[in-house]
Regions:
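C-terminal structural segments of small proteins and small subunits
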Residues: 2-22
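NTP-dependent small-molecule kinase module
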Residues: 25-41, 139-152, 166-175, 179-192, ...
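ATP-binding Walker
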Residues: 52
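ATP-dependent small-molecule kinase phosphotransfer cores
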Residues: 77-149
Length: 251
């Protein structure tokens, strides 16, 4: 083999030939982006069941890698604010339900009560908000690619699969935690009853569906450090792929 080349092993334990000058970069514990450009920003969608511990995973990624994290729930909240994309449609949908405060803000507790008893209205709300959230995500993705500031863009969304974000993400990651562990976390951290947890679990996708659609699975059943080490390995593997892609482009 050429002395300028080196065989390294990726996350799937397959050997990939890369330039030797990148080998030190690939085995650091964190991203070193000094040798790489941002014009091929990687877009990762992250999902998993309620109580899977996604918040800790996202916090670790944001703290240790050059990435931006977007939360679909926060985006949904934002697009429903007065003057934003969905607001006028929501005014029409909830015109008779007294869900708007005097200053125009939405009384979200009151809205939740209305939606709980009106399935048709809940579906109508989803048909308004979900497309607006997806369009916001697409716009931000395009801005990030143009700005070339972040190596990785991450979106966390409970409905990542249902809303077909695989169409715009480069890959999806599934944060896996057993139902038993998720139930314990939801009781301890959020005070949820078994009945509420059962209803939540019944409304979510099966583990097999998550695994079928998502490229990667992170086991978050044990210590946080165990999950973090899996993330480090995945991010190193993505860096190997990026270097290999860059080599191919330059040849």
């Amino acid at each position: 083999m050429d002395n300028s080349l080196l065989a390294v092993r990726d996350i799937n334990h397959k050997y990939i030939v890369v330039e030797r000058k990148y080998s030190e970069l690939l085995y650091q514990n964190r991203y070193d982006n000094s040798e790489l450009t941002y014009n091929d920003m990687h877009f990762i969608g992250i999902t998993g069941g309620v109580g899977a511990g996604k918040t800790a995973i996202l916090s670790y990624l944001e703290s240790n890698y050059p990435c931006r994290v977007m939360l679909a729930d926060e985006i949904a909240h934002d697009v429903m604010e007065p003057g934003r994309d969905c607001y006028r449609k929501l005014q029409e949908l909830f015109a008779k339900d007294q869900v708007f405060e005097a200053d125009g803000q939405i009384d979200r507790k009151r809205m939740a009560q209305v939606l709980f008893s009106d399935e048709e209205k809940r579906l109508a709300l989803n048909n308004i908000v979900h497309p607006a959230v997806k369009q916001y995500v697409i716009d931000e993705m395009n801005r990030e690619r143009a700005a070339q500031k972040n190596e990785v863009l991450i979106l966390e969304a409970a409905l990542l699969i249902e809303e077909h974000y695989d169409e715009i993400c480069d890959e999806l990651w599934y944060i896996y935690t057993s139902e038993k562990n998720r139930r314990e976390r939801l009781k301890l951290n959020r005070g949820y009853s078994d009945e509420k947890i059962d209803n939540i679990f019944a409304s979510q996708l099966s583990e097999s569906t998550y695994r079928e659609v998502c490229r990667e699975e992170i086991d978050n059943n044990h210590l946080p450090e165990d999950a973090f080490s899996q993330i480090d390995a995945l991010m190193k593997a993505r860096q190997v792929e990026k270097v290999q892609k860059r080599q191919t482009t330059e040849e």
